[in-house]
From Swiss-Prot:
Taxonomic lineage from the root: Eukaryota, Metazoa, Chordata, Craniata, Vertebrata
Role noted for this protein: May function as a negative regulator of TGF-beta signaling and thereby inhibits activin-mediated mesoderm formation.
Transmembrane spans: 39-59
The protein's name in its UniProt record: Protein TMEPAI
Similarity field: Belongs to the PMEPA1 family.
Keywords: Endosome, Golgi apparatus, Membrane, Repeat, Signal transduction inhibitor, Transmembrane, Transmembrane helix
Bilayer topology annotation: Single-pass membrane protein
InterPro entries for the chain: TMEPAI/LRAD4
Motif (SMAD interaction motif (SIM)): 183-186
Lumenal side: 1-38
Region (Disordered), start-end ranges: 76-97, 201-222, 256-285
Amino acid sequence: MHNLMGLNSTSESIHSNVSCTCNCKRSLFQTMEISELEFVQIIIIVVVMMVMVVVITCLLNHYKLSARSFIHRHSQGRRREENLSSEGNLWPSESTVSGNGIIEQHIYTPRPSDRLSVPSFLQRDRFNRFQPTYPYIQNEIDLPPTISLSDGEEPPPYQGPCTLQLRDPEQQMELNRESVRAPPNRTIFDSDLIDSSVYGGPCPPSSNSGVSATSYSSNGRMEGPPPTYNEVIGHYPRSSFYHCQQPNLATPSILESNRLQPGNHGLDSTITRSKDKDKQKGQPF
């Protein structure tokens, strides 16, 4: 029994030793894995921090350089303005009187830095040129909205960037037709006008040269200025003088009746004047 008990005890001790060694190995592997993971995490964190530091330093350097350049330009502009103002104040005093009574002439010689420097107003214009002007200025001064119209080289029904439609297309075409007319191809002789005013009613236009048809309306009134004496006499043949001399009594009554008509007042006055002159010239014959 004791032997058996001893064997059992030895076997148990062996099993316990084996289990201990296995547990120890497992714990070592786990600790090694954990330590490796932690090391990798630490390395990643350090790299990220270094990258962030580099980015921040680059940004700070960039803004520092831009701020320095801006301050330097501003200081240079102030110095130039001060130099120009001081030179402008000293400019009128070109000659000064010394203590000995000798007049000393001061000649202005520009410095090389002044020759190479750009005036301050040009710098201001250059900086203001790049400032945003639209739409702030337009809102401040309350300008109306811009309307893009044609440049006039397109046909009357404007097509393209034109956004303003003043009239209907048909109305615009009708206006274009009415505004552009062909010259008249028919003329009215002065004798036809006189006959129409005396006997009433318009006569058909003749082919002879005379007053244009556009200057003669439907009611027989001359719209333009009255014809001159030479024009009226030039159109009459010689036989018309004798024809006008014979009815000496009938023509005044006809002329007086025509004078009463308000529509033919302008034409009748010219007719009477021309006939009176014809009578005066026709009496010796």
